[in-house]
A protein has these predicted regions:
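Active-site neighborhood of HAD-like aspartate-dependent phosphohydrolases
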Residues: 1-43
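Acidic, Mg2+-coordinating phosphoryl-transfer loop and its flanking beta/alpha structural elements
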Residues: 120-161
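Short acidic-hydrophobic, aromatic-tinged amphipathic segments that line or gate anion-handling sites
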Residues: 103-107, 158-165
Length: 180
């Protein structure tokens, strides 16, 4: 969600001798997009995951916005990444000087229980399935727009295009809370 959602394409194209573009990434199951088996994708990912996740580019304005948000909010990163990527994830956040109150590397896409334990008010997500699951548990979700998450939304999900829009929505929510 803080990184470019298509960061993996160049590596996958090189490895599988393909020519996939970001426009073709219309679903979250990457092996289907590439036209390979899940096992083939898993083998590829396991070979390069540390390199891939250490070099993924950060989204425009994400660092600055998170730094501003941390002044009035707790910032938790809840990621579905595998546990073996926990140290790398901390290093990545520190490299970009991204402040946080906690990092939760779940090794699973199911984030609801952790979000409940942390009493999250807003969840920023790019996975459609995660957004739906979180929203059904009454979390407000800001779904960062990607080619692979453009499906119908419910009342607890707001589609956002960038980190400035995320900031504006959260700031508006904070002002409404203060007014009450």
């Amino acid at each position: 969600t803080i990184t470019d959602p298509y960061y993996w394409i160049e590596s996958a194209n090189k490895y599988f001798n393909k020519n996939i573009t970001a426009d073709e990434v219309t679903q979250y199951e990457l092996h289907k997009i590439i036209g390979i088996t899940r096992d083939e994708y898993t083998d590829f990912y396991n070979k390069i995951k540390f390199e891939l996740h250490s070099k993924e580019p950060i989204r425009k304005d994400a660092v600055e916005i998170i730094q501003k948000l941390t002044e009035l909010n707790n910032i938790y990163f809840i990621t579905a990444r595998e546990k073996c990527l926990e140290i790398l994830t901390h290093k990545y956040l520190n490299k970009y000087e991204i402040p946080y109150d906690g990092v939760y590397v779940l090794g699973s896409a199911h984030k609801v229980d952790t979000a409940k334990k942390l009493n999250c008010d807003i969840f920023i997500e790019d996975s459609y399935e995660n957004a739906i699951e979180l929203s059904k548990s009454n979390f407000k979700v800001l779904l960062v727009d990607t080619n692979y998450n453009r499906m119908p939304l419910n009342q607890n999900i707001t589609r956002v295009l960038n980190w400035n829009e995320i900031y504006n929505i959260i700031e508006k929510m904070l002002l409404q809370e203060k007014a009450m």
